[in-house]
Every structure is written in C-alpha cells, then in structure tokens.
Amino acid sequence: MADLIFQDWGLINYDEALKKQNDLVEKVHTEDLPGFLVFCTHPPVVTVGRATQAGDVFSWNGPVVEVTRGGRATYHGPSQLVVYPILNLAHVRKGRKDREINPYLKVFEDAIVDVLKTYGLTGIEGRSSAKSSFNRADADDTGVWVNDLKIASVGVGVRKWVAFHGAAINLTFDEKAFLGLRPCGFPSEVMVSLEQLTGAKVDVGEFKEKLKRRLLEVL
C-alpha cells in the first residue's frame, strides 16, 4: 500500500531531524494523512529513550539527546541508515487494526528481515522466541537480530495516534560506534553491521531502495 510520502533527508543533525519529525506528526494528525516514510543519516549522537537505565551511557563523550521514544540508549552515526515512519495509526492497514502499536512494530521489523534475506541472511524480530547468548533478562527486546547479534535497533513514540521515531540499521562497520554505552541494555559487542555479516562492501543506495520498496508495500 504505497500511500506514504517518501522523503530522504540525507545527512542531518539529530536535533533538526527531531524537529522535522514533530512537524510531520502534527501535519499527519491535522490533515489526517496516511503518513511519511523518512530515510536519513545522523552525525554521531547517542539518544536515550524512556526506558534508559543508570549505567547505559558510561563513557560516551559525544552529544546525548533525551527523546520520547520507547527503549533505552542507542547510538546513531554515519555507518547507519535511520528510518522514520511517521505513520497514522488511526488508519487501518493490512495485518493490523486501527490504533494498534505492537502489530505495527512487527510489520516494521519484519520488513527489515525481508530485506536481509536478499543478502542471504536470516534475521529475526526482537520479540520472537529466539534468544541471544547475551543476557537478555534486563535488556530491550526490540530490533532485528541475526543469530545472536543485533543489526537494527528499533524504538518508536506515539503522539495523537501518529507513530514517529523508528529504526537505526547498521550498514557499515565503525569500530567507534557504540563505545561507552550499553546499547539497548546490551554490551556493545552484540551490535553488528551488514558489512560484517556479509563480508562485502555494502551498496548503500541499493539497500535503501530495497527497504524503501518493501516498507511502502507493507506500512
């Protein structure tokens, strides 16, 4: 159902992107639009969600932004593709009724899983029965995993029944990413990139096109 409006913001500071998200949330609510699908990339920044705990950020020396999304602390940076669906949850979609959040999250994560399949990878969404070898008892179970490694972090917020925030997908390897924090409550070693998993250079444009096509089909 390709009725979302797609925008690619390119490289954009997190604060500016958050303001633009908030503006789109108001637009979707006021005009009763289906929503927007936004792709972008951020300079290095750590965001802390509503469930962040003491000790999640312990030696990160870059900018930190408090946000209203669910989940805990995570990193955003140039090695990632960040995806922000600004979605009107009051509109019924295939696979979910109106004003349902968890079914939306599953569809969102499963779309990322579907794209990973095209790279020969078997991903699984975070609330499945699959468990990491890392201790998950006190960690955030959202996101997309390949075996016991996490390739995508997912956290959303909802205001006026419009979903915003979204996912950060690790595409290329950056040894400095996630240092000084426990992303989503896990040790930083749990995070992995598409480049590491495939052992090949990632065509970012190709990945973006695949994910854009899939998300516009299912959201």
UniProtKB/Swiss-Prot annotation:
It is an enzyme of class 2 (transferase). GO terms for molecular function: lipoyl(octanoyl) transferase activity. InterPro entries: aa-tRNA-synth_II/BPL/LPL, BPL_LPL_catalytic, Octanoyltransferase, Octanoyltransferase_CS. In the reaction, the free carboxyl group of octanoic acid is attached via an amide linkage to the epsilon-amino group of a specific lysine residue of lipoyl domains of lipoate-dependent enzymes. This is Octanoyltransferase. Its main location: cytoplasm. Coiled coil: none annotated. Residues 31-219 form the BPL/LPL catalytic domain. Pathway: Protein modification; protein lipoylation via endogenous pathway; protein N(6)-(lipoyl)lysine from octanoyl-[acyl-carrier-protein]: step 1/2. GO terms for cellular component: cytoplasm. Its EC number is 2.3.1.181. It comes from the Bacteria. Pfam families: LplA-B_cat. It catalyses: octanoyl-[ACP] + L-lysyl-[protein] = N(6)-octanoyl-L-lysyl-[protein] + holo-[ACP] + H(+). Belongs to the LipB family. GO terms for biological process: protein modification process. The gene is lipB. Substrate binds at R69, G70, G71, R72, A73, T74, Y75, H76, S153, V154, G155, G166, A167, A168. The active site is at C184 (acyl-thioester intermediate).
